[in-house]
Amino acid sequence: MTQSQYRPGPDANGLFGSFGGRYVAETLMPLVLDLAREYEAAKADPKFLEELAYFQRDYIGRPNPLYFAERLTEHCGGAKIFFKREELNHTGAHKVNNCIGQVLLAKRMGKKRLIAETGAGMHGVATATVAARFGLPCVIYMGATDIERQQANVFRMKLLGAEIVPVTAGTGTLKDAMNEALRDWVTNVEDTFYLIGTVAGPHPYPAMVRDFQSIIGKETRAQLQEKEGRLPDSLVACVGGGSNAMGLFHEFLEEPSVQIIGVEAGGHGVHTDKHAASLNGGVPGVLHGNRTYLLQDQDGQITDAHSISAGLDYPGIGPEHAYLHEVKRVEYVSITDDEALDAFHATCRLEGIIPALESSHALAEAIKRAPKLPKDHLMVVCLSGRGDKDMQTVMNHMAAQEKQA
């Protein structure tokens, strides 16, 4: 496997090796083919790229900083840890990088209505935000379980003018919300644009979302070059569907000196049935229009994912991650709920930054690795979102711990 083979994908059929593709209903096939054509044309259009750059700068607030986490570094006593500060974006997470790109594409295609799925609510908020900015009606599908644990984001979406449809099917989480959004799309193909929030779904979504998120890695390369005069030694990011990770990783896939680590949600532990680690605990199968690693039982039924973090609570993973796992370019590990919570508290106390519980999984892995590494090792952690949305979850967890004590 030569280095140049890590970054070419996907092929014309949307495949990364044997992963990805377009497994969709016949009614949707013309739509995804049309979307792929439109996206290729937009990518080659200087006017589209200029408009995208304008919104990235003046609306999202990019570039965001690459911040040296000095006290966390001292605390760990090893590698020099940097945070890529995606939580400082408008709307508080990396999700908006992708939403602004897709809404510009929807506008270019003459679509009049946006739909999206959301888990933690951050993609829903980002979609509702861009819908408001461009004056488009917007329907967000959200699992009833997630609505319960993400009240603040639900209210934000409503304030921004979005309609929220609670999904009670299945476990009432992200997978079920995505199923409902796909059903809506099939019924409203003419005027509706489905704004998928992660590097999953049928081609061209995994590649398109990755491309809109790849600004994370491009900025990181330039910023670290300026600060340290060289490439990072390692990159760490959390992986649910995997868009913040793909955004950071893609720029460095062909740099053999850069070690890349994706962190899955280990829940109560990958040895239990309460986790969301598709690569460490799943097998290949087809879900939501693409072939990838999935959590499923012996009959091929999708099993429930569990994570303390709503944004990682998905039983699959983006197909490009599945490919990078198989060719061993990226190392995928898992972090438990408890380890993520410890890292969450440490980052609050040491750096004065309240990270999202999703990002806390990446921070936990960084805290684990850093002490074993030399002091000149440069480690970049993607701080994918801020933790405001997780206050209730953390409060509940702390209250439960106090009761046990």
Curated annotation (Swiss-Prot):
Organism the protein comes from: Pseudomonas putida (strain ATCC 47054 / DSM 6125 / CFBP 8728 / NCIMB 11950 / KT2440)
HAMAP family: Trp_synth_beta
Pathway per the UniProt entry: Amino-acid biosynthesis; L-tryptophan biosynthesis; L-tryptophan from chorismate: step 5/5
GO cellular component: cytoplasm
Protein family according to the UniProt entry: Belongs to the TrpB family.
Pfam families with a match to the protein in the record: PALP
Entry keyword Lyase: yes
Name under which the protein is recorded: Tryptophan synthase beta chain
Cofactor list: pyridoxal 5'-phosphate
Protein EC: 4.2.1.20
Gene, per the UniProt record: trpB
Keywords, sorted A to Z: Amino-acid biosynthesis, Aromatic amino acid biosynthesis, Lyase, Pyridoxal phosphate, Tryptophan biosynthesis
PTM annotation (N6-(pyridoxal phosphate)lysine): residues: K95
Role description: The beta subunit is responsible for the synthesis of L-tryptophan from indole and L-serine.
